[in-house]
Amino acid sequence: MSLSLWQQCLARLQDELPATEFSMWIRPLQAELSDNTLALYAPNRFVLDWVRDKYLNNINGLLNDFCGTDAPLLRFEVGSKPPQMAVLQPASQHASEAPSQAAVARPRPSRPSWDNAPVQPELSYRSNVNPKHNFDNFVEGKSNQLARAAARQVADNPGGAYNPLFLYGGTGLGKTHLLHAVGNGIMARKANAKVVYMHSERFVQDMVKALQNNAIEEFKRYYRSVDALLIDDIQFFANKERSQEEFFHTFNALLEGNQQIILTSDRYPKEINGVEDRLKSRFGWGLTVAIEPPELETRVAILMKKADENAIRLPGEVAFFIAKRLRSNVRELEGALNRVIANANFTGRAITIDFVREALRDLLALQEKLVTIDNIQKTVAEYYKIKVADLLSKRRSRSVARPRQMAMALSKELTNHSLPEIGDAFGGRDHTTVLHACRKIEQLREESHDIKEDFSNLIRTLSS
């Protein structure tokens, strides 16, 4: 056996796992094979625990496939694999200080000297990080699990894990919360860390002021000497050529210094119109992760946690009632709950389903008016450039069947209709056909980036 065994495992895992999962969890691992033991080295404890919990069976299964009864034992360690004696350099060259591999699409020059970074007293940094947003009060679900995990790793290992980290998704899904959580995590680790959070428009405004005041060099020095730069809604750089030019050079300078960059957007990097290709390319150098609208269970958990923070008893059936009717984003959910709580405080009434119907009657009526099966069918047909009649027909070609399955899945997600009712609306189909369509789309969202994007785009369109 040789180290090529791990290369074979990597090749199979890359084929079997979604690209984001492979880049985030498997690619960072280093392997050492000796004495019939395969040691896998993870960059930190968080990655080690995750890989051991989620992928141990996959890896052991591959080792058995490739080696049979001669399969090596598997061992996990935190850190980098020991240097091989044959390639050791003299101590003066510090060969043993070589960095561990980072899970990025582009190699990093060197590990950051984070703990020894000099502080420049002549510059005053304002972090703008909201201390209320942290990882503990971020409700995790299937829709945001990878994004939270990636953000947590960046907070634990800024400049070394995923750089840049690019989070994208619709409005009100938790991107900004994660930015602040990372900032708070970094500053908890190092109190004097220079962490700057801002909206992209603030960067533009600062650059314009610097140009007006002939202070562009100070502007450059400020932004290029931070330890972590967290920029929200990067899509607002669109068509601002001078701002893009300056950010391009700032981006390069930060990456070369292994200073952390985290960006958010409402869309996938390559879909941001009005932004230069060279910038969009750089956005994808590290790790790009989507945040999707929360599923029902996560929406319920968000409501229960928010109620608990406000010392309000929210019955479970009421939380489910609200969550099943308001699906677009977290901000809308929290706003609805705030209205319910305020009404309950003003009237002194108990929070029941009937009370919620009354308190949110205009919001619920608008939601039901906007999202109907008919509207979903029209939106999906327009998105895929087919006719609504095709969705209702018996045609089974993939160009029609896949959009039909998507429309059925969206109808289940966004309306309160039963499976038989949805089937009737799609040409009198059986409820088992609808169930199969929903399961198929759920599976494809895990396996196909395109289907995942289509689902998110359609949810965003229908919920706006």
From Swiss-Prot:
GO biological process: DNA replication initiation; regulation of DNA replication
A molecular function (GO) term: lipid binding
Region (Domain II): 82-127
Amino-acid positions noted as binding ATP in the UniProt annotation, renumbered to this chain: 172, 174-176
Region (Domain I, interacts with DnaA modulators): 1-82
SUPFAM superfamilies in alphabetical order: P-loop containing nucleoside triphosphate hydrolases, TrpR-like
Signal sequence region: none
Gene Ontology cellular-component annotations: cytoplasm; plasma membrane
Any Pfam family matching the protein: Bac_DnaA_C
Region (Disordered), start-end ranges: 91-118
Protein name: Chromosomal replication initiator protein DnaA
Native species: Sodalis glossinidius (strain morsitans)
